[in-house]
């Protein structure tokens, strides 16, 4: 592909992205981003309109054309096999995409649909697909017990927020004989945006952001709603995501990132050993653990000691890496680690560059 053609595709990709996210400023932003004239931007817009990717809605107003919009509720009893659902219902609606994007969609759909079949106790599942020239979005909704409620009851946890903390660690399943507990974790990392709404909890992950977001919603959502969205021309691959959470020469899911703030409730401080033990549950299943201290302003001595001295001494085979810690948290971690750091060779990167 020649350089002018690459640049033209980059410009049109930028226009498509901004038409979807903020159409009112697409022309000005494109001019600034690529240092081109207004006339040049309009030329690229006309190209996209001619391709059928954009619709002209009036003076200076454009929107992405829907290439596919499909919504269907199906019986789980009549459709128990995720690969058959993919082949007969989903792949024809998603249509032509690069192989790497199709592989991501296959993984996401089959993992999430299988979770509905095996765990939700729902009789039906609704699937919605919306595809434009730029992105494809899929929503999978069931009407069962709810994913966070299921985890809370199966593991005897405090509440649904505690269930979210466990889910974000990975390797979590309520059926260890039939599942690895990796599906939701890896699916959430593969897509541009991924969210789960269930009960009173909204969990969201965006690809280029390390941390997960969790919100308390006012109205209780029955069952579970899952949304997955991906750019059609993504360069991402499933292998790339799997490799990101594999430590060194190891094979398998051996590395995880734990958002420490999910162990907090409201404005409480992380000060106690019981809070630390809650954070450390199932961490011994990994070989490398990154504790992300984003939005954690301070931690107590007992909390730090339990994580960075007691647990570290008991599990010398696990590499513990705190990231994105502020000065106060860093100092407390250093105090807890004093005397054991040289012996265990634990890594420490408060800025998250490891």
Where are these regions (language model features)?
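Short, glycine-/small-residue-enriched flexible loop/hinge segments at domain edges that mediate gating
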Residues: 284-299
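Flexible coil/turn residues that form the inter-helical turn or adjacent wing/linker of helix-turn-helix
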Residues: 22-23, 284-287, 316
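A short acidic (Asp/Glu
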Residues: 206-207, 300-305, 331-333
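Short, non-transmembrane amphipathic alpha-helical segments
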Residues: 303-314
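A short acidic, amphipathic alpha-helical/loop segment
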Residues: 186, 278, 306-307
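Bergerat-fold GHKL ATPase/HATPase_c domain
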Residues: 1-110, 119-124, 235-280, 319-354
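Conserved beta-strand-loop-beta-strand hairpin that lines the nucleotide-binding pocket
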Residues: 55, 60-71, 116-239, 312
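A structural signal for short secondary-structure junctions
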Residues: 220-221, 282-285
């Amino acid at each position: 592909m020649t350089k002018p053609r690459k640049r033209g595709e980059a410009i049109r990709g930028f226009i498509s992205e901004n038409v979807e996210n903020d159409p009112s400023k697409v022309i000005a932003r494109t001019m600034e981003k690529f240092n081109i004239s207004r006339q040049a931007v309009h030329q690229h817009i006309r190209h996209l309109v001619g391709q059928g990717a954009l619709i002209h809605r009036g003076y200076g107003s454009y929107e992405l054309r829907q290439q596919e919009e499909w919504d269907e509720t199906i019986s789980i009893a009549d459709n128990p096999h995720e690969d058959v659902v993919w082949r007969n219902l989903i792949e024809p609606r998603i249509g032509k995409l690069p192989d790497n994007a199709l592989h991501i969609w296959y993984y996401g759909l089959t993992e999430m649909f299988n979770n509905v079949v095996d765990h939700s106790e729902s009789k039906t599942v609704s699937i919605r697909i919306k595809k434009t020239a730029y992105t494809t979005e899929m929503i999978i909704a069931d009407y069962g017990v709810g994913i966070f409620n299921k985890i809370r009851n199966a593991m005897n946890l405090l509440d649904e927020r505690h269930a979210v903390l466990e889910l974000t660690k990975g390797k979590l399943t309520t059926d260890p004989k039939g599942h690895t507990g990796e599906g939701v974790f890896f699916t959430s990392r593969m897509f541009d945006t991924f969210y789960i709404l269930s009960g009173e909890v909204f969990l969201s992950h965006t690809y280029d952001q390390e941390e997960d977001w969790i919100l308390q919603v006012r109205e209780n959502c029955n069952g579970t709603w899952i949304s997955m969205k991906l750019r059609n021309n993504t360069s991402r691959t499933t292998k790339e995501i799997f490799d990101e959470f594999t430590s060194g020469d190891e094979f398998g899911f051996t590395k995880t990132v734990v958002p420490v703030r999910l162990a907090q409730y409201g404005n409480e401080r992380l000060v106690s050993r019981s809070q630390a033990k809650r954070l450390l549950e199932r961490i011994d299943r990994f070989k490398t653990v990154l504790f992300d201290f984003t939005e954690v302003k301070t931690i107590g001595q007992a909390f730090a000691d339990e994580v960075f001295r007691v647990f570290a001494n008991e599990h010398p085979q696990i590499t513990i890496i705190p990231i994105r810690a502020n000065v106060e948290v860093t100092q407390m971690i250093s105090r807890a680690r004093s005397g054991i750091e040289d012996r265990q060779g634990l890594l420490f990167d408060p800025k998250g560059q490891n």
